[in-house]
Curated annotation (Swiss-Prot):
GO molecular function, one term: magnesium ion binding
Keyword GTP-binding among UniProt keywords: yes
GO CC terms in record: cytoplasm
Similarity annotation: Belongs to the adenylosuccinate synthetase family.
Organism from which the protein derives: Acidovorax ebreus (strain TPSY)
Encoding gene (name): purA
InterPro entries named among the record's database cross-references: Adenylosuccin_syn_GTP-bd (IPR018220), Adenylosuccin_syn_Lys_AS (IPR033128), Adenylosuccinate_synth_dom1 (IPR042109), Adenylosuccinate_synth_dom2 (IPR042110), Adenylosuccinate_synth_dom3 (IPR042111), Adenylosuccinate_synthetase (IPR001114), P-loop_NTPase (IPR027417)
Name this polypeptide is given: Adenylosuccinate synthetase
GO terms under biological process: 'de novo' AMP biosynthetic process; IMP metabolic process
Role description: Plays an important role in the de novo pathway of purine nucleotide biosynthesis. Catalyzes the first committed step in the biosynthesis of AMP from IMP.
Binding site residues for substrate: V326, T327, T328, G329, R330, S331, R332
Positions of the catalytic residues: D18 (proton acceptor), H46 (proton donor)
Keywords: Cytoplasm, GTP-binding, Ligase, Magnesium, Metal-binding, Nucleotide-binding, Purine biosynthesis
Amino acid sequence: MKASKGRNVVVVGTQWGDEGKGKLVDWLTESAQGVVRFQGGHNAGHTLVINGVKTALHLIPSGIMRPGVKCYIGNGVVLSAGKLFEEIEGLEKAGVEVRSRLRVSEACPLILPFHAALDVAREAAREHGGAEKIGTTGRGIGPAYEDKIARRALRVQDLKYPERFAAKLRELLALHNHVLSTFLGSANFQFGDALKPYITGGQVQFEPVFDEAMRHAEMLKPMMADVSRELNEAHAAGANLLFEGAQGTLLDVDHGTYPYVTSSNCVAGNAAAGSGVGPGHLHYILGITKAYCTRVGGGPFPTELDWETPGTPGYHMSTVGAEKGVTTGRSRRCGWFDAALLKRSAQVNGLSGLCITKLDVLDGLRELSLCVGYELDGERIDLLPMGAEEIARCVPIYENIAGWTESTVGVTRYEDLPSNARRYLERIEQVTGVPIAMISTSPDRDHTILMRHPYAAD
């Protein structure tokens, strides 16, 4: 299938993140000239395996691994400049050219050390007070978005004006240090090594934060851009663009399992707001979903299995699927595929097609269970409800489907899959009402079954 020109594709996770978006974005960039991150921060983690070499990315779009592809960090991303340059330097050591191909929106809010301090201290305060932790990564994402919504954030463009930056920084420190000391008891809190250089007596200090920001400013200036303008000009010139979502739909701040969510909108609609490209220019929405479900951190998970006991299906998923977070290293909870959850994701994203990942992880399981709905307070429903409280009361309704013992690793043609694997995929299509466009059969870029190319003309 030949890709058309001037076609834009949005890639989103349909579950709780970790669906394998990085590999598929990398694969799709063969047909794209630009890749855009439009939300989240360095709490995201995308792993690519190319020719057996594993690369983990947190901020830079996955398209950076394709020579000649331009990469953009849109205004919807909250940016830790320090983490960005760590990532750039790591890629450059591996021989990847980054700086000439990366553009960073001047409208990105900055993540600064006091944001991470607030994040860590709040989780500690919740735990100390007996409340369940949200399960944040502790990287300051939520507090940075709070400053953005309150219209007090320091943004990338502020780095060009040191005096203005310094004045706004002092105002922010006065506010956030008050919260840290008065409400969170930061004077008695032991911050980790990464934050210690900025903190004295539980207070974040002006000088180390300002000095570091000014160092980053000089390195960042060549990459600062009006990303919205550049993307619209590229589209007008016939470029194919790929919009790379982070996390997943069920972590969306509005549509996820609130309050066990991230602090941004992870759904496809935010690709427009988070990049400055109008929604009429988004032509295909590809939903990435694992062949089973995983979740990191707290919050309800209707189809969760025992994933710690050897010999159980959940343990098989956890070990064969190597289910540990790219960013945090935390073990992911594992469970059966939830088609009722996917129906919710399909609705809020307007999915055009699905990509099923990690099908190969299910190899060897003789029987699979597919959640097709729930019983909630005595009533049968076929769509995931809104909010954590009702979701926690959902009892999954399963269909049992025969598994397969044959290996699917590396299969690249649909007809070469085991017959039971094909039946499993067909049932997912039937229950969710969304056609499968792609199937991933290993972490390797080339181990992909293409059924409908997202960049092909309709």
